[in-house]
Curated annotation (Swiss-Prot):
Subunit composition and interactions: Homodimer.
Single GO MF descriptor: NADH binding
Pathway, per record: Carbohydrate biosynthesis; dTDP-L-rhamnose biosynthesis; Bacterial outer membrane biogenesis; LPS O-antigen biosynthesis
Organism: Salmonella typhimurium (strain LT2 / SGSC1412 / ATCC 700720)
Keyword Lyase tagged: yes
Its job: Catalyzes the dehydration of dTDP-D-glucose to form dTDP-6-deoxy-D-xylo-4-hexulose via a three-step process involving oxidation, dehydration and reduction.
GO biological process, one term: polysaccharide biosynthetic process
Protein name: dTDP-glucose 4,6-dehydratase
Length: 361
């Protein structure tokens, strides 16, 4: 099987590419614009494979994407290319509209025209797999807001959309486009919505890598508000395995939620990281002493949590990592890969971190 992957140099995309090349016989065509979060070093251990191909291109460039489709003749598309950081979407939403909405439209149109011209067998087996987020659903009741006896709800595949940030609104828009292209044109699409990912090769603007690296550098560990926001954490390699299972075994027209069964308050996540660092690289005082509280994000969702029962029942997928095992692997990876970290932390990234976090104190 030949799979065209957009955004394959990003955090989740590179995990998918590594998984496919290392664990299957499928061929990958990786399309990536290589924006700040795209890093080919994340693919260095598979880049010489004769089943791996890289194309430096923008999904908004329809002519170039058409050329790539015609050259490689993919059997499936896995669409991961996206702007994905909520804070960046608040200060600069235009890039999110362009990539996540306009880019998805452009890719859908190229894929639709390509699919329409395929022979019957290849046409029937083709899949356009759109990878999305649980943030499109908005947020869920927080334990602080309900009585102890009440069972807290989870996001399911039929939860109504209620995005609350420019990022989640742009992803919700792209989800709707994908489903419309199936209903209107018959394009065999699948949508997956995932919870918060973590693991190796994560760009250090996100909570877990930011805390690990700031802790090691003796910098403040910024916590939004009281740190009581709850997220479900999914180890990225578990997610990659699920995504490949969906594109190869999932049913066209379906939606699958993918979660890690690990609801944690942000502050507890930071405590766990600090305690691991105290154990692995101890210093005179606990890393917890570096925690600092900053002004909360505007419109910050209080709780996300996914019901991943459907993908478990229908495809047999379950996460292999607990949060405790996955976060230990993640911390150990960052300790062992300082060169990768140094290479991605450019001057532009440092300026953004200073503006976004230090300006909130």
């Amino acid at each position: 099987m030949k799979i065209l992957i957009t955004g394959g140099a990003g955090f989740i995309g590179s995990a998918v590419v590594r998984h496919i090349i290392k664990n299957t016989q499928d061929t990958v065509v990786n399309i990536d614009k290589l924006t700040y979060a795209g890093n080919l070093e994340s693919l260095s251990d598979i880049s010489e494979s004769n089943r791996y191909n890289f194309e430096h291109a923008d999904i908004c460039d329809s002519a170039e994407i058409t050329r790539i489709f015609e050259q490689y003749q993919p059997d499936a598309v896995m669409h991961l290319a996206a702007e994905s950081h909520v804070d960046r979407s608040i200060t600069g939403p235009a890039a999110f509209i362009e990539t996540n909405i306009v880019g998805t439209y452009a890719l859908l149109e190229v894929a639709r025209k390509y699919w329409s011209a395929l022979g019957e067998d290849k046409k029937n087996n083709f899949r356009f797999h759109h990878i999305s987020t649980d943030e499109v659903y908005g947020d869920l009741p927080h334990p602080d807001e309900v009585e102890n006896s009440v069972t807290l709800p989870l996001f399911t595949e039929t939860t109504a959309y209620a995005p609350s940030s420019p990022y989640s609104a742009s992803k919700a828009s792209s989800d709707h486009l994908v489903r419309a292209w199936r209903r209107t044109y018959g394009l065999p699409t699948i949508v997956t919505n995932c919870s918060n990912n973590y693991g190796p090769y994560h760009f250090p603007e996100k909570l877990i890598p930011l805390v690990i690296l700031n802790a090691l550098e003796g910098k403040p560990l910024p916590i939004y508000g009281k740190g009581d926001q709850i997220r479900d954490w999914l180890y990225v390699e578990d997610h990659a395995r699920a995504l490949h299972m969906v594109v190869t075994e999932g049913k066209a027209g379906e939606t699958y939620n993918i979660g890690g069964h690990n609801e944690k308050k942000n502050l507890d996540v930071v405590f766990t990281i600090c305690d691991l660092l105290d154990e692995i690289v101890p210093k005179a005082t606990s890393y917890r002493e570096q925690i600092t509280y900053v002004a909360d994000r505007p419109g910050h969702d209080r709780r996300y949590a996914i019901d991943a029962g459907k993908i478990s029942r229908e495809l047999g997928w379950k996460p292999l990592e607990t949060f405790e095992s996955g976060i230990r692997k993640t911390v150990e990876w960052y300790l062992a890969n300082t060169q990768w970290v140094n290479n991605v932390k450019s001057g532009a990234y440092q300026s953004w971190i200073e503006q976004n976090y230090e300006g909130r104190q």
